[in-house]
Amino acid sequence: MGRSPASSCLRLISCSGGDDTSADPNSTALENKSSGDKRGWSFRKKSGKQRGLITSVVSETTPASRTRETLESALLKSPSPDNNNVSEKQQQSFSVDEKKSQLPVVTYVAEPVDEKKTQSVIEEKTELLSVEEQIDHRTEVSPVIVESKGTETEEDDLIGTELQGPSAADAAKIEEDVTSEVEMASKVEPEESESDDVIIVRKESDEKVDEKLDESVIVVIQAAVRGFLARRELLRSKKVIKLQAAVRGHLVRSQAMGSLRCVQAIVKMQAMVRARHSTKDGSRVSATSDKSEPNAAAQKLLENKFAKHLMESTPKTKPINIKCDPTKPSSAWNWLERWMSVPKPEKTSKANLTTEEQNLEETQNVKISPQADFVNSDSTVENKTETDMPSYEASKVEGQNVELSETEKMSQYDSPEASAEVYYDSIQSQPLAAKPDSLLEEPEYVDGQIKHSLKRKVSNPSFIAAQSKFEELTSSTGSNKAMTLSSKDDVLGEEGKTDIDSPDTTNTIKDHSLEDVTPAELSGSECGTELSVTSSLDTLEKKSDAEGAEPRVEAKLLEDDTFKTDQAELIEIDVKDATSMGTVEDPKEKVENAKDEVEISATHHEPVISTPDSKKRRAEDESGPQAYALSEGALTPMTITESQATPASQASSSVKARKGKSEKSGSSQKRKVSKKITSSPKQEIGTGEATEQEEGKEQKSGRRTSFGYDQEARESSGGKNSLPRFMQPTQSAKAKVQEHNSPRSSPDLQERDVVSAKKRHSLPGVTNGKQVSPRIQRSASQAQQGTKDRKWQR
């Protein structure tokens, strides 16, 4: 049998070193055919990646079934005789070793071969004996490299297997090792590279190392590392914070030093500017007084320890960057200009203050110095009159004048606005007389605050009308009173004893009004106008006290007709007193009260006529334009106080003008004076049997009734009670007043009034149950009837 070229593939198996493979080129063609035969019956897709051999380890990414196919294909390279042609040769080969015959049986079952391909292979393989010999003599199978070319998209695969074992047992061991390795590789994804296989091996080694280490040791190591990192970060943050604090402290200190230097420079410049102004104006005293304050402040600032430390630590010659350009708006320039502004000393204001202080001292001296003359004149005049003022009244007037300066200061400094209002009301309610300049300059004492309050008051139109009316009345009153006083001095002929001037009376009246009004204002009332009404009523009553000393030089015997006219005047006055508070609160009664007030205000201009027709003429004359003017004024409290102030003074002055020559012995006068001083107010209220005492008590009770109904009118008007409840008149006093009341046209009452009036020579006009004239008693009865009717109407 000749050898065919196909036997070259068998030579590859026979060579152990693999040197013949490179020499024989036909072996590659046979292997390509066998791989093509394999592709024909293989149903699995080959991977496109190359596989290489690793020493002692077979690394494959294909599953176990694919590795078995490659193994079986490698085993097919061994001679597989056909059933028909090579039966004898197979029997000979299997007889040599039965164990080796198992391998081809396994391959036949696993891999069936097509008939056409097997026939071509059988034809090429002619020499089978040589194969048997090689199987007998060779213990190792050389590695067969199968090169299989896939499709166009697949890459060439290089599969290398190393099979050891001359027997079937060795082949079985090799197969088991390959399957175990394939199972380990199957755990990895099929598309991993050779590096992944190395990583798997390393992981196994790490697991072995971890099993050996203890967990406590690992925790200690981790804690140490973390602590070191935290400490390093903390030190880094501390260093940053220290650096920031140092920079900020430097900046703050420099800024504080700059501000301190600025303040010090400003203080020095202010001192220089003030010194220059003082030398320029000539007023060194004011400059030094102003200069002491900033120096004290600068010293206090520089004595601070922190300021000293800053001043010492920084250089003194540090420039201050300030742009002194007044044309351009700059915050630094404005700040410096504001601190450097120095007010000029006002010479005019200081001069005015000095003159006003001198006027104050003069007026206080005037108010206090004539007091002795006033008391002396009272004592001399009492020798010629039957009735007199009680002794405690004189002491009261004296005490009020002495305490004037203190009350004036308290009213000016404690409540400037309230004092301004009260002072203005008290001045306006007085009858103006001989020294108008000194009286009119006084409201300007409280640093201009009174001027503001007066401006606010003048803005009221009703107040303007009332003020204009009051000025006309006071001007005429002053002239009439001056005339009556001059005539009185001529009649009396005693210049030293009866030296009672109008300024003295105005000053005393001003004292009473100030002393009574300021407590009312300081008591915390809500309405200033209401307080002005009450204070003006009190001032009216106290005016009658002060003026009661003047008409004591009256004549004892007067004619009946003159008494009637005087009685009519005083009735009108007291009717206004009783109804004045009603006009403030009740708007329905304004018309009636307006008529009464017109009658009162008109009495200043009318001459005193001793005929009973004078009342009718006055009523007709006054019902004209004056009533309209007062009704237009809306009857403010100021008009009430103004209209109340003048009638009492006018009545007293008119009585003084009509005085006859008084002819009465001093002894009889002193006896009656002593009797009336010892009499108590309770005895004055009670009724007596003697006609003279009864008439005198009627006069006193009449005055008490007018005062009581004045208070009752205040209560009914809904305003605040100026007197407490225990000082108001009792029911018994009111009942006694009602017994004496009768119609105005009653002839009995007129006769009784004439008899009592013959013995009356003065108008004391004292409140709180003191002696009064019967004229006021009749006015009180009319006021009582009017108030009763109004109550029933309500």
Curated annotation (Swiss-Prot):
Q: Where is the IQ domain?
A: 214-242, 243-265
Bias-annotated ranges (Low complexity): 643-654
Q: Where is the composition biased (Basic and acidic residues)?
A: 487-500, 539-555, 585-607
- What keywords are assigned to this protein? Calmodulin-binding, Cytoplasm, Cytoskeleton, Nucleus, Phosphoprotein, Repeat
Name of the encoding gene: IQD32
- Residues of the region (Calmodulin-binding) are 230-241
Instruction: Name the residue ranges with Polar residues bias.
Output: 23-33, 56-65, 80-95, 473-486, 768-786
Q: How does it assemble?
A: Binds to multiple calmodulin (CaM) in the presence of Ca(2+) and CaM-like proteins.
Its annotated compartments are: Nucleus; Cytoplasm, Cytoskeleton
Return the protein name.
Protein IQ-DOMAIN 32
Q: What is its main location?
A: nucleus
Role description: May be involved in cooperative interactions with calmodulins or calmodulin-like proteins. Recruits calmodulin proteins to microtubules, thus being a potential scaffold in cellular signaling and trafficking. May associate with nucleic acids and regulate gene expression at the transcriptional or post-transcriptional level.
Q: Name one GO molecular function term.
A: calmodulin binding
On the tree of life, the source organism's domain of life is Eukaryota
According to the record, the residues making up region (Disordered) are 15-101, 277-296, 375-417, 472-555, 578-794
Membership in a protein family:
Belongs to the IQD family.
What's one Pfam family the UniProt record gives for this protein? DUF4005
Per the record, its GO cellular-component terms are: chloroplast envelope; microtubule associated complex; nucleus; plasma membrane
Where in this protein would one find the motif Nuclear localization signal, according to its record? Answer: 657-664
Give the Phosphoserine positions (modified residues): 78, 80, 142, 193, 195, 369, 459, 502, 544
